[in-house]
Each structure stands twice: as C-alpha cells, then as structure tokens.
C-alpha cells in the first residue's frame, strides 16, 4: 500500500467561533467562504478545499485524519488487503464524500483506536488561498499538509500496523527518559514516512491517549519570519504556548508548539528535512531537539512528567 500524504483532519468543537478566531487570526489560515457554514468551519491553507474541518458537536476533540491514496485502484487494493487481514472498515457515505470533497474513501481504526480515512480524488477548488495574516504560503503539495502524532500504549502493535499494513517506513526512533529517575522506563516514539519526502507524516508515542484525542499536528510555512510572527500572534491572543522555539533533531524543523481550542497542540514550523528515502537509514535521535523546545508541561506522556524537556 502506498499512502501519498496527510490530506486533512476533522475536529469536533462546542465553539466554532473560537476555532474561527484561532485559525484566521493566529494561524493565518483562510476560512473557506463556500464550504463553511453554521455547523462547520473549513480552514484552507493551500490549493485544496480545506485541510482542517471543524464541526459542531458536544465535545472538544480531534476526530480523524484523512490519508490520501493515488487513485481508485490504490483504494481497491487497500480494501483487498483489509479483507485478507480481516480488518474492519466502513465505506464513506455520499454525504461524507461531499463534505470532504473527495471521490471515494473508507474509514477504519488503527490498533490504538485512532480513526483514519483512506481516500482518493480530492476535488478541485477554484477559490484561491489568501492568508488573512499575509502568510506567503504553506509547504504542502506532494508533501501533504503536515503530520499527526498519536498516543499508543500498545505501541509495538500499532507500529507494526503502520509499517506492515499501511506501508509506512521508519524515519527515526526515539527512546526518551522522561523522568529524572534513570531507573524509570523510557518512552518510545516512532516517526514514520509515507510515499513523499516529508520526514514523517505519522508518529506514535508510547503513552495513554489524551482527552483531546491527539498529541499534535503540524503545519509548515516557507520562512522563519512567518514562524516568529505566528508566535507573536499567539502570545498577543493569549494562546497557551506549549513549547518555546527550537530545532528538532530528527526532521530539523524550526518550530514552536501552541495549544489549539481542541486541546491538542499545533506545531508551527519551518525548514523541515526532506530525506532521499533511497539513501536514508533509520536514525535513532538521542534527544527531541538540538536547542530550544522547552515544554511548559508534558501532559499524558509519563507517570513522572518534568517541567522541562530538552
């Protein structure tokens, strides 16, 4: 199976206005004028109809991620693989297909319980992306819109599913000491790539799933100034900054983390690595970052969290 990229995420909220303000005034996303209405907010960051869809509901939580396949044949092949392995999946309804602006798709759960959609054929959108905050553009196209990081207590089973069923490859593996006590067990993280040059499209960390349903997602801009300006906007709008500016060791991304209205984090970055997979060997980074990325807290990631992670 060859998954091309991360196409979109869906989020549930009790307060669309909070997401509207956050998406436009802090992140610089564009509210799609045609697909947004009183029940949902579609946030556009490039040529696609949207990358974030936020819909009214009883909770504040991440719902699902949509992973893109190349064509109808690839989707049919995925169904055959699932059938052979007795993996349950559901066909997306006509309403779902229209709402997501896709041609066809299915949904299923990974072994950690995360809801995923596989789809093909994103419909064309004639509405040009114009950032309300003057962002020159987000790094997307063949790379997809970014990445998602899930929590998975059954990390080895979940990792095996992504590698051997969905066809991902390992980019980097971390084993981090989260507690000041060196005798405490380390936390494992797998960073996995699909069929594009983004360093990782999905990552999983060995921890309980947070109440928000997701650890974080990521978007990438084209200049370091646009990262700094987003950080200023977040601070000026009283957004919780989950991590200071820093450069990651594995994907070289310069970024900061801020909390979304849904409770999960958004990494806002620049200059992510784009490996040549024909030459890449899986790395084992000894630390999350070369510098910076001081986290204000480590919720849901360790029984003995510390205030700073270097």
Q: Could you say what each language-model-derived stretch is?
A:
Residues 19-24, 82, 113, 158, ...:
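Conserved active-site tyrosine of GNAT-family acetyltransferases
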Residues 22, 53-57, 66, 119, ...:
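A structural feature that tracks compact, well-ordered secondary-structure segments
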Residues 84-144, 188-193, 238-302:
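Vicinal oxygen chelate
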Residues 300-310:
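Single conserved hydrophobic/aromatic residue that forms the stacking wall/gate
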């Amino acid at each position: 199976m060859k998954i091309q990229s991360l196409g979109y995420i869906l989020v549930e909220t009790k307060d669309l206005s909070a997401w509207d303000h956050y998406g436009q005034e802090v992140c610089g996303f564009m509210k799609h004028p045609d697909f947004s209405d009183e029940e949902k907010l579609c946030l556009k960051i490039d040529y696609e109809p949207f990358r974030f869809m936020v819909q009214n509901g009883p909770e504040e939580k991440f719902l699902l991620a949509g992973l893109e396949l190349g064509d109808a044949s690839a989707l049919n092949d995925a169904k055959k693989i699932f059938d052979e392995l007795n993996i349950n999946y559901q066909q997306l309804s006509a309403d779902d297909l229209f709402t997501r602006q896709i041609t066809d798709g299915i949904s299923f759960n990974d072994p950690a319980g995360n809801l995923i959609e596989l789809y093909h054929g994103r419909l064309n959108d004639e509405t040009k992306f114009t950032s309300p905050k003057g962002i020159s553009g987000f790094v997307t196209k063949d790379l997809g819109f970014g990445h998602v990081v899930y929590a998975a207590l059954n990390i080895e089973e979940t990792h095996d599913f992504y590698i051997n069923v969905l066809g991902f490859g390992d980019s980097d593996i971390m084993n981090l000491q989260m507690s000041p006590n060196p005798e405490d067990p380390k936390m494992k993280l797998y960073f996995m790539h699909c069929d594009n040059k983004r360093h990782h499209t999905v990552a999983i960390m060995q921890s309980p799933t947070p109440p928000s349903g997701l650890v974080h997602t990521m978007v990438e801009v084209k200049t370091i100034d646009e990262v700094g300006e987003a950080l200023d906007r977040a601070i000026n709008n009283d957004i919780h900054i989950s991590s200071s500016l820093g450069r990651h060791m594995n994907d070289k991304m310069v970024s900061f983390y801020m909390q979304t209205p849904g409770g999960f984090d958004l990494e806002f970055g620049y200059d992510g690595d784009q490996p040549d997979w024909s030459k890449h060997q899986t790395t084992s980074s000894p630390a999350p970052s070369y510098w910076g990325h001081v986290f204000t807290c480590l919720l849901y990631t360790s029984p003995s969290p510390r205030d700073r992670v270097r």
